[in-house]
């Protein structure tokens, strides 16, 4: 295997809750209140939608076919293999990742190559002042059963999404007895208002069981799937092991070819006046109210 090249899950497409638009001659992020599933191809209008976007949108329970939940499957049992997250500082001009840390230690490009330094988190790091460093998370998920190892990637710099996804993955992993990859899950878009958002709703991504499935039934189903897979010779532990090795094959997981896209979407100076989570006007509140009420009813 080539050293210095991070081996990450094969990506078939992207899941986002926003898009890049042109305003005043500049390309800036525009937030949204729904999911969009795209391919990895761009044209003059932006990312080309993946066929799965239209298929899932047609099944959406709301009248305007806004996609606010997506059925998904995790590829790995280890939560940290499905969700990757670090504090990340990019060069705004080249898109090159300069520093990546976990709050304790970091890998940083220096005069002598990649150097190891303490990571005090962005609030306390002199290199990160001015919002240059943010948490950057990538969730790898499977949407298409015809390609068991193909993934769609959800990228975010939002604390709410990263924190919620990390918690859910660990809880489901523990509750199912290390059968995370066998659970029937779905991505769910949620909204809340805070003082920081000036009481307008901000949107973040949650991970839940599929609608109509309780935890006991999900675990029972996961055990059956696990037994069938083992009987067929499938070795999940080996898959997790190889994935862990692949991630660790390089100092930085993010390649230079995708760095500029990440900077444009998440580290854009024009977006400082916006919330780094998905925020919208109060006019959108009524539009998502039914979805939020359904979530509450499901919990009750």
Give residue spans per PLM region.
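Short amphipathic beta-strand/extended segments with alternating polar/hydrophobic composition
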Residues: 84-93, 151-157, 219-220
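Extended serine/threonine-enriched, polar tracts that run as long, contiguous segments within proteins
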Residues: 128-216
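Generic structural signal of hydrophobic/aromatic residues within well-ordered alpha-helices
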Residues: 165-168, 172, 218-222, 238, ...
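Generic surface-pattern signal
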Residues: 170, 174-178, 210-212, 223-227, ...
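Primarily single-stranded nucleic-acid-binding OB-fold modules
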Residues: 178, 184, 260, 264-267, ...
